[in-house]
């Protein structure tokens, strides 16, 4: 993370120096178009692009950290490993109380996550129907689910 911050800081400093260079070259040229001003503008454009790249990299890093924290929180919540802010330990009554669902193992959570990802990919490809599923379009329900067959 320090490398990303340092890279962003250096790119910003170079960008600011390049913008100052443009202003100084315009002032020394008396507002007239000059080779020195054109060179300063090219340098400014280059530093601007490098600064944007550094910003994009920092944004990607922040997003990946947010996703990792979210995943860790999801696993902690699902497996019952949550803690309270005060005291650092959650009583058994508090763990899982928010959802009133029993905790599941991290392995089971990962299996379910993979299954959901697979289904999303299948839906994106347009198939939408898992192999072996029996779906009757004329009746409007999926016979795999007993609650649908009572309709």
From Swiss-Prot:
Domain of life: Eukaryota
GO cellular component, one term: mediator complex
An MF annotation (GO) of this entry: transcription coregulator activity
UniProt-annotated location(s): Nucleus
Keywords carried by this UniProt record: Nucleus, Transcription, Transcription regulation
UniProt effect for mutating residue 73 to S: Loss of oligomerization
GO biological process, one term: abscisic acid-activated signaling pathway
Positions of region (Disordered): 128-151
Parts forming coiled coils: none
Protein family (similarity comment): Belongs to the mediator complex subunit 32 family.
Task of the protein: Component of the Mediator complex, a coactivator involved in the regulated transcription of nearly all RNA polymerase II-dependent genes. Mediator functions as a bridge to convey information from gene-specific regulatory proteins to the basal RNA polymerase II transcription machinery. The Mediator complex, having a compact conformation in its free form, is recruited to promoters by direct interactions with regulatory proteins and serves for the assembly of a functional pre-initiation complex with RNA polymerase II and the general transcription factors.
Subunit field text: Oligomers. Component of the Mediator complex. Interacts with MED6. Interacts with GEBPL.
Listed name of the protein: Mediator of RNA polymerase II transcription subunit 32
Organism the protein comes from: Arabidopsis thaliana (Mouse-ear cress)
Gene that produces this protein: MED32
């Amino acid at each position: 993370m320090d490398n990303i911050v340092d890279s962003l800081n250096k790119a910003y400093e170079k960008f600011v120096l390049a913008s100052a260079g443009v202003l100084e070259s315009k002032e020394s040229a008396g507002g007239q178009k000059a080779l020195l001003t054109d060179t300063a503008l090219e340098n400014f454009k280059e530093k601007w692009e490098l600064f944007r790249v550094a910003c994009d990299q920092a944004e990607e890093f922040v997003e990946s950290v947010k996703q990792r924290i979210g995943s860790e929180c999801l696993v902690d919540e699902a497996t019952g490993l949550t803690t309270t802010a005060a005291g650092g330990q959650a009583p058994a009554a508090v763990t899982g109380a928010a959802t009133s669902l029993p905790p599941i193992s991290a392995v089971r959570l990962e299996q379910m996550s993979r299954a959901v990802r697979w289904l999303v990919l299948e839906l994106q490809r347009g198939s939408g129907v898992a192999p072996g599923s029996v779906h009757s379009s004329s009746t409007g329900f999926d016979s795999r689910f007993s609650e649908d067959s009572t309709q």
